[in-house]
Amino acid sequence: IAKPCGLSDLLDLIENRGIRAVVDCTHPFAAQVSHTAMLACDCTGISYIRLERETLKAADYPGVMRTPDFEAAARLVASLEGTVMLTIGVKHLPIFIDKRCGPNPRLVARVLPHPDSVARCLACGLAPEDIVALKGPFSVDFNRALFIEYGVTAVVTKESGTIGGTDAKLEAAAQLGIKSVLIERPRLNYSVVADTVQDVICYLFNQGCSTKGTALVDDKATAPLVRQSRH
């Protein structure tokens, strides 16, 4: 499943396709999707397992400031000076713009190169020169070059894990001696959590399930993991 799916849709899918287990591979910040998947499994009595991305150790990167959510990150950014690059997508951009008092700090948004993403940046009041439309994840060297080009003094990113390129951003910022604002993942009480695809497969077979009867709730960022689990 790689599209928005409400509870009723997921329940119908489970019933119509004889699903016996759900593997939740969604983005760490897709909390509502995970909650819906767990609820659907509770309602139908089938197995649920969360494939969680590795958590980064912020202590490994100098200059990292952790915040519990987007609101806290926006308040922190509003107190900074210079140029802050936001690498958080477009959904929460208005929070950062609303918290800012005046033109400082300068906000530069790095977003996906989709017309809708760019349009939403412009609608928020960002100037074209403050919009970087690129699809990552990128290497440390690429991030370094981008931060230097835009004169970035702080970068804001989500705790998306290595697969989302968070480590490369933090490392690039650390090498340049600039601040990093790291937004922590939402805390959910997952019923069962696995760290690797192999652990997921072992769990499924221990539950008497096979990947053939398993629904994979996924997003594009974790697609390679899902392909592995189908072998």
Features from the language model and the residues they span:
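C-terminal functional extensions of proteins
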Residues: 147-150, 154, 159-162, 166, ...
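Anionic-ligand binding region
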Residues: 82-130
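Short acidic-hydrophobic, aromatic-tinged amphipathic segments that line or gate anion-handling sites
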Residues: 1-4, 63-71, 192-203
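Glycine-rich, highly charged phosphate/nucleotide-binding loops
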Residues: 1-14, 132-142
